[in-house]
């Protein structure tokens, strides 16, 4: 997917990027590739692949939750890595208030330099473990309209890291390449325990390749009990779903 095809694919869904936004995506790609030579940010480096599998893929969130396109919303990206999906969302929808938390300082450093280069405002970056960021005494707990994670971790693990950060009546969306029935069954009780309810499993395919994607939308229907998330490392070692 070259940049022109990226712009057209978004326009087909009613998302129109102006020249400045297109320039920001181009600058993002160039800086990502130059910095990737110094640190491991992504294994995807060809321009067409980055535009499709990182940029376009990130923006599928706004196809499933169209309110992201127009409303002022607080969005927390847990484990953003090289900035996906939060930085593409911020470029396309500048009114969003973005918070990024990542456990690796060098990735936060990259994102600090990137946001400065792209002149993005209302982007807060935190070097922290998600378990600590959403702990019971954290000022960030239950403070975001939307929390998202685009990660390979199991859904029950992601739910424990992310749902404590979601406001009442807010949403958590896990962006996954696949969502197996077994994973959803294992996560269902964990999601309920954490105050969530699975509202939608939005199945999509990427243009050109047809690669499958699942956006699992979870509504926050009640407060997360104070004992969650558990201490750093425990959610991964002892998932609530029992996997």
From Swiss-Prot:
GO terms for cellular component: cytosol. The keyword Cytoplasm applies. It is an enzyme of class 2 (transferase). Keywords: Cytoplasm, Methyltransferase, rRNA processing, S-adenosyl-L-methionine, Transferase. Residues 222-243 are annotated as: Disordered. One of its GO terms (molecular function) is rRNA (guanine-N7-)-methyltransferase activity. It is found in: Cytoplasm. Its EC number is 2.1.1.-. Pfam families: GidB. The keyword rRNA processing applies. S-adenosyl-L-methionine binds at residues 79, 84, 130-131, 150. Belongs to the methyltransferase superfamily. RNA methyltransferase RsmG family. Specifically methylates the N7 position of a guanine in 16S rRNA. This is Ribosomal RNA small subunit methyltransferase G. It comes from Lacticaseibacillus paracasei (strain ATCC 334 / BCRC 17002 / CCUG 31169 / CIP 107868 / KCTC 3260 / NRRL B-441) (Lactobacillus paracasei). The gene is rsmG.
């Amino acid at each position: 997917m070259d940049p022109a095809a990226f712009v057209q694919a978004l326009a087909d869904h009613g998302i129109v990027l102006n020249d400045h936004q297109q320039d920001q995506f181009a600058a993002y790609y160039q800086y990502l590739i130059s910095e990737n030579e110094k640190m491991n940010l992504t294994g995807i480096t060809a321009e067409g692949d980055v535009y499709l599998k990182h940029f376009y893929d990130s923006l599928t969130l706004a196809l499933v939750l169209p309110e992201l396109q127009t409303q002022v919303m607080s969005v927390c990206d847990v484990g953003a890595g090289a900035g996906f999906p939060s930085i593409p969302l911020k470029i396309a929808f500048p009114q969003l208030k973005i918070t990024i938390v990542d456990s690796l300082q060098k990735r936060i450093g990259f994102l600090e330099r990137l946001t400065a280069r792209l002149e993005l405002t209302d982007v807060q970056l935190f070097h922290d473990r998600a378990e600590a960021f959403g702990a019971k005494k954290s000022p960030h707990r239950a403070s975001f309209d939307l929390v998202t994670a685009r990660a390979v971790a199991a859904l029950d693990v992601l739910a424990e890291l992310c749902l404590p950060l979601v406001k009442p009546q807010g949403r958590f969306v896990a962006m996954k390449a696949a969502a197996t029935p077994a994973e959803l069954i294992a996560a269902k009780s964990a999601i309920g325990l954490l105050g969530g309810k699975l509202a939608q499993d939005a199945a999509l395919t990427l243009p050109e390749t047809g690669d499958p994607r699942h956006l699992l939308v979870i509504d926050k229907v009640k407060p997360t009990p104070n004992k969650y998330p558990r201490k750093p490392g425990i959610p991964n070692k002892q998932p609530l779903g029992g996997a």
